[in-house]
């Protein structure tokens, strides 16, 4: 359970929102604080990219899918594992989808 601006938001045991429609930027900030991530414009770009990906494909991207899709849309400098790992050190697909308020990617342990 997360308290965001006085509103209780349900999460699973790993901290992913149970109801993605409860996501907003304040939720992302609260989750980022728990994950020890200071959000920058680069983080927001990935968070919104992941949310758009989910809207289009109805699935949270695993790391390979995320890297490939980002490289196609944002270029090789942002669509690579090193760049994403720098932003999300506990696992780009795992942390980016968590901050985006989406379900945990199926291939994340």
Swiss-Prot record:
EC class: transferase
Gene3D superfamilies linked to this entry: 3.30.1420.10, DsrC-like protein, C-terminal domain
E.C. number(s) listed in UniProt: 2.8.1.-
One Pfam family from the record: DsrC
Localization (cell): Cytoplasm
Entry keywords, A to Z: Cytoplasm, Transferase
Domain of life: Bacteria
Positions annotated as active site in the UniProt record: 108
GO CC terms: cytoplasm
Primary site of residence: cytoplasm
GO biological process annotation, one example: tRNA wobble position uridine thiolation
InterPro entries: DsrC-like_C (IPR042072), DsrC-like_dom_sf (IPR025526), DsrC-like_N (IPR043163), DsrC/TusE (IPR007453)
GO molecular function: sulfur carrier activity; transferase activity
Record function comment: Could be part of a sulfur-relay system.
Assigned protein family: Belongs to the DsrC/TusE family.
Protein name listed in UniProt: Sulfurtransferase TusE homolog
Origin organism lineage: Bacteria, Pseudomonadati, Pseudomonadota, Gammaproteobacteria, Pasteurellales
Protein encoded by which gene: tusE
